[in-house]
From Swiss-Prot:
Catalyzes the NADPH-dependent rearrangement and reduction of 1-deoxy-D-xylulose-5-phosphate (DXP) to 2-C-methyl-D-erythritol 4-phosphate (MEP). The gene is dxr. The lineage of its organism: Bacteria, Pseudomonadati, Pseudomonadota, Alphaproteobacteria, Rickettsiales. NADPH binds at residues 10-11, 13, 38, 122, 124, 203. This is 1-deoxy-D-xylulose 5-phosphate reductoisomerase. It comes from Ehrlichia ruminantium (strain Gardel). Its cofactor is Mg(2+); Mn(2+). NCBIfam families: Dxr (TIGR00243). One of its GO terms (molecular function) is manganese ion binding. Its EC number is 1.1.1.267. Belongs to the DXR family. Keywords: Isoprene biosynthesis, Manganese, Metal-binding, NADP, Oxidoreductase. The keyword Oxidoreductase applies. 1-deoxy-D-xylulose 5-phosphate binds at residues 123, 149-150, 174, 197, 210, 215-216, 219.
């Protein structure tokens, strides 16, 4: 039986991970569940998977969680201390599903503790942690396996094939909820319309990122670090059906594509069983049921957010600009979700923040967090002025 801990268990991806584990309950023992503030769901999850330990990041919710778990043997911890305790547990797999840059510090804790495998469903920690994160992972001999469908697809292709003669790595994107809308329609789009993704079941933040296509820029930077590939060998193509998740092209003209039904549980299953595979628990791909598969070049005029990743990878200060980009996006998306700015303002806030913030040296975790803090203040000020 394999042991596993889940960081971010109450989020959209975390709940899918729980579903996969429950469907294979004889194969996994859950050591720890970590959540931000959803105590009701965390307590329920702890009971159904028989977790040994739970951590709630919000220390003010300790008593409520304790009451909910009264009569069980579940250990309860809180805050940063609890996070470090959960990170230090000896487990076979850690599933990292915390949203945003909030995952970065726990990632450092996990890598520093020398966990065997981190299944990573968080791109922001890679974008902001950059080479510092991956250098530490190499030093500690920690395997980082991407859960996101696109990077998981590329990882699986490269795991079984030649890595030396790659000509291009292509990340696909569904195009999000607003693919076929024009700017006039986008100008007054509502939050509810934006988060209705046509293919994927996702959380609010990533649904907005998908709609702006900023998600593809984050993924381009993520791929740059995950696969140690130059930016000119990275590409994006829009594929609304979301059946092809990634393509690796080789110098001889051959291309290997990874296909599956658009279900995150497939990549979750792979990361939970890596380097092996478990039997399919969910719907399998039937290509005959698809009359056609569509591919198109991204419209960078309509969706300028898709350019950001490539532009940042061409700058002399990739690490700092990646942090500023990610932070500005987090602030802008939050403002849109709270109806403080319009949809089209999101990318404008990102570009304005990149123009106004300059973090010169990123040599440590504290440098990353300081740059994030500065960019957060500037982006917030920009949004205040828009109002």
């Amino acid at each position: 039986m394999k042991t596993v801990s889940i960081f971010g268990s109450t989020g959209a991806i975390g709940q899918m991970i729980i579903d996969v584990i429950l469907a294979s309950s004889d194969s996994y023992q859950v050591k720890a569940l970590v959540a931000k503030s959803n105590v009701q769901l965390l307590a329920f999850q702890a009971k159904v998977v028989n977790a040994e330990m739970v951590v709630i990041a919000d220390v003010g919710l300790y008593k409520e969680l304790k009451d909910l778990l009264f009569g069980t043997n579940v250990k309860i911890s809180v805050g940063d201390v609890g996070m470090q305790m959960a990170a230090s547990l000896n487990v076979d797999y850690v599933m990292m599903a915390i949203v945003g840059i909030a995952a970065l510090v726990p990632m450092v804790y996990l890598i520093s503790a020398g966990v065997k495998v981190i299944a990573l469903a968080n791109k922001e920690s890679v974008v902001c942690g950059g080479t510092l994160l991956f250098n530490l992972a190499r030093e500690k001999n920690v395997n980082i396996i991407p859960v996101d469908s696109e990077h998981n697809a590329i990882f699986q292709i490269l795991h079984s094939n030649d890595r030396e003669n790659i000509d291009k790595i292509t990340i696909t994107g569904s195009g999000g909820a607003l693919l076929y809308m024009d700017h006039d329609q986008m100008r007054n789009i509502t939050v509810q319309e934006t988060i209705k993704h046509p293919v994927w079941k996702m959380g609010k933040k990533i649904s907005i990122d998908s709609a702006t296509m900023v998600n593809k820029s984050l993924e381009i930077i993520e791929a740059y670090h995950l696969f140690s590939v130059k930016s000119e060998k990275l590409d994006v193509i829009i594929h609304p059906e979301a059946i092809v998740h990634g393509i690796v092209s080789y110098v001889d003209g051959a291309c290997i594509a990874f296909m599956s039904v658009p279900d995150m549980k497939i990549s979750i299953m792979y990361t939970l069983s890596w380097p092996n595979r478990m039997s399919m628990l969910y719907k399998k791909l039937n290509l005959a049921s698809y009359h056609q598969l569509t591919f198109m070049k991204p419209d960078i005029n309509k969706f300028p957010g898709i350019r950001l990743g490539f532009e940042i990878l061409r700058t002399s200060n990739i690490h700092a600009n990646s942090i500023i980009f990610n932070t500005a996006n987090e602030v802008a998306v939050d403002a849109f979700l709270n109806r403080k700015i319009g949809f089209l303002d999101i990318v404008n806030v990102i570009y304005s923040t990149l123009d106004m913030v300059d973090c010169l040296h990123i040599n440590s975790l504290s440098d990353i967090l300081e740059c994030d803090s500065i960019a957060r203040r500037v982006a917030s000020d920009i949004i205040c002025k828009l109002n």
